[in-house]
């Protein structure tokens, strides 16, 4: 069985968020770098830097923690992997779901690279739905 790097990223971010860790380290691939750029641009993470250790590259992510009035620190409410290696989910640009009425984001893998649902609708292209963030 192969590794699902996208699921690994999502799980690492979710676990670090629940444990209130400030930084996490994930393996650096082209897909992970593109997803992290989207998360940085959308404001879910604070900082990203590339780190090399024994000829292997890692991305070190600094999570953005916002304090809720009730007490706990939360960055990302929910992350969910949609398309997976055993069941690929595709959508055209007209049927891309809106998460929380547009408050959440959908990350898609398209023929023009990895992008958010808003960018895909503007360009009029669909693709594989990788994950939801809300």
UniProtKB/Swiss-Prot annotation:
Key words, A-Z: Chloroplast, Plastid, Ribonucleoprotein, Ribosomal protein, RNA-binding, rRNA-binding
InterPro entries tied to this protein: Ribosomal_uS8, Ribosomal_uS8_CS, Ribosomal_uS8_sf
GO BP term (any one): translation
Superkingdom, taxonomy of origin: Eukaryota
GO MF annotation terms: rRNA binding; structural constituent of ribosome
Subcellular compartments: Plastid, Chloroplast
One cellular component (GO) term of this entry: ribosome
Pfam families according to UniProt: Ribosomal_S8
Assigned protein family: Belongs to the universal ribosomal protein uS8 family.
Function as written in the Swiss-Prot or TrEMBL entry: One of the primary rRNA binding proteins, it binds directly to 16S rRNA central domain where it helps coordinate assembly of the platform of the 30S subunit.
Record text on subunit structure and interactions: Part of the 30S ribosomal subunit.
Protein name: Small ribosomal subunit protein uS8c
Species of provenance: Eucalyptus globulus subsp. globulus
